[in-house]
Amino acid sequence: MSKFTEEELTYLKTQRIGRLATVNERGEPQIAPVGFRYNEELDTIDIGGHHLAESQKFRNITRNGLAAFVVDDVVPPWQPRCLEIRGQAQALSEGGESVLAQFSSALIRLTPKRIISWDTSTKRSHSARNV
């Protein structure tokens, strides 16, 4: 059983870009737009990119393994929607092509520990929970 609700999963599957937040060795935050996919088998968010293994975000994850990930958009007339996922992340040397064929082999895998969502479906709703 997934940690995500059906509405959250449906929303995730309609989005292509998210923002990954990590912290560097000086304790400074870094955020970057990234490509991703929901990994149904592991119930994780898998993040890929070009030259991912050489990136600051990959080094940050290798060092401390903490990350937050946000997917958001706005639908007319003005309805912001958002899914924030906080959790434990792994920097892996293989699997990036599963996100998008053009990506490098490196992969960041985020396992949710806290999920915050609002208005991810047609119903106006807000949810925050530890998972």
Regions found by a protein language model. Name each.
Residues 1-19:
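Short, basic/aromatic recognition patches
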Residues 12, 60-61, 110:
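A generic structural signal for nonpolar/aromatic side chains embedded in well-ordered alpha-helices
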Residues 51-105:
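Short, structured beta-strand-loop surface elements
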Residues 80, 93-131:
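C-terminal edge-of-domain segments
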Residues 36, 87-89, 112:
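A structural signal for short, well-ordered beta-strand segments
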Residues 16-50, 69:
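Short beta-strand segments
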Residues 42-44, 66, 88, 114:
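Structural motif
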